[in-house]
Amino acid sequence: MQLISKIKEELFFARKMIQYRYGPRCWYRYIKNKFFPVFLTRRVQPISIPVNCDFEWHIMTPKRGLWMTYWAIRSFLYQSNLCPKIIVHDDGTIDEATARMFESKFSNVKILRRLDADKFFDTTSNIPNIIKRARKSKCFFILTFLDHFFLSNSSKVMITDNDVLFFGKPQEIIDFMLGASKIDAMYFVGEGEGRNALPVDSLYKKKYADILDDAARLNSGLIIFNKSKIKLESMVEYFEHATDFDHHLIEQSGWGMILSQIPHAFFPEATYKFRGGVEFPVIFKHFTSPRRHEMFAYGIDKVRQQINS
């Protein structure tokens, strides 16, 4: 069944690349970047940059996503001139040797193994039981909500997916992390009129009616927040009113509801994007599943060219 799914995925991407007339070079890049992630990561030279700012960046990735993660990190370090402590969360597929290899490529990166994260939640007594129960959700992405929050150790935190790249200077992030912003959270939003379903009951929706629209717009591909402003009680309340812990948006709607309760803003839609090209003035692009081929076919090499120019 998994093989059939992979074949269908590749046929989908092939049709897209044919439809938009991708040339031989893009096909070569797609094959190279997608199918040889660990091999390519092993070959890159280590980068040693001292941590120069007081915030943490948390990313979760499978082993096959390490090449994407590598370029997400490289693009941010280059464009922002910030060097935070970066914690890459293992989804359970990264072996010890591969984890140590990836850590060796950056002086500021630590891989947190899934087993260690599981042990933390199992043995930490002051985490409410409802949080521990929610973490056992069938929706894998719940880990990018709970693990990234509870395992972060700085007041300011950035969270991204691993399928993101920065193509310009992220001034909004720089200002926030350096204390030049008056808000306590900023997040990436869906383009246009798109809204997410919020799997919460009517009482909760009524109580927070004034922020529901903002919460429903959040996309968790890029969020930044002041952790000290988020109350544990707010997270507990969200799960107490969640209608289905296994809902596919339980994580994303959770971030939306929690972050929308504190002073917040959206990243500008004109420069932080899902769709379209990556030329100026685009700063950031989230290469979500239907557009993942774009990251492999031209996104990674665009970043490489910017860094080497």
Where are the regions that the model predicts?
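Membrane-proximal basic amphipathic "stem/tether" segments
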Residues: M1-N52, F296-S309
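Cell-envelope/extracellular polymer assembly enzymes that use nucleotide-activated donors
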Residues: E56
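Active-site beta-to-alpha loop of glycosyltransferases that engages the nucleotide-sugar donor
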Residues: T61-W67
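Short, acidic, metal-binding catalytic loop of nucleotide-sugar glycosyltransferases
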Residues: S75-C83
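Short internal beta-strands
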Residues: K85-G92, Y187-V189
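Active-site-proximal specificity loops/subdomain of glycosyltransferases
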Residues: A99, E103-L151
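GT-A fold catalytic core of metal-dependent nucleotide-sugar glycosyltransferases
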Residues: F145-N196
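Catalytic core and acceptor-binding pocket of nucleotide-sugar-dependent glycosyltransferases
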Residues: G192-E193, L212-R292
